[in-house]
Amino acid sequence: MAKESSFDIVSKVELPEVQNAVQAALKEIKNRYDFKGSKSDISLEKEELVLISDDDFKLEQLKDVLVTKLIKRNVPTKNIDYGKTEHALGGTVRQRAKLISGIDQDNAKKINALIKQSGIKVKSQFQDDQVRVTGKNKDDLQEVISLMRKADLPIDVQFINFR
């Protein structure tokens, strides 16, 4: 078996699923008693979530509702980078949350280092926003997938193009 096998390690957030989770969270907020009369809102602007609420406590509750809905839709919550809470107009507070899509250089280096430290006979290289892993043996590639799932990475990773 001279042919090499490969797969890609990527980190993606499905925006339609995020939009569905936002809509479900807004629907729940509209019906919850503790949010009656409050100015709470969640919006998706390109690849950024904007959470607005009356105070910090309600903002945290808003985040909890959103995270619950994201988890139900299988959206990785590790890929959400919450910014600082800022005071907005009308006595409300706002928080922006950036959706991280793609593997940046630092995380790619961590992934490559983990693979090299494991001693598995595969090669890994960083391409654009993904890491390609190649090896002669498919069992080695599956071992790398298992290693990545166990690793405590700051982002959620998926595995695609297993050939």
Swiss-Prot record:
Q: Name one GO molecular function term.
A: nucleotide binding
What top-level branch of life does the organism fall under? Bacteria
Which SUPFAM superfamilies does the entry mention?
Answer: YajQ-like
GO cellular component terms attached to this protein's record: cytosol
What PANTHER family does this protein map onto? UPF0234 PROTEIN YAJQ (PTHR30476:SF0)
- Matching NCBIfam families, A to Z? PRK05412.1
The name this protein goes by in its record: Nucleotide-binding protein BPUM_1028
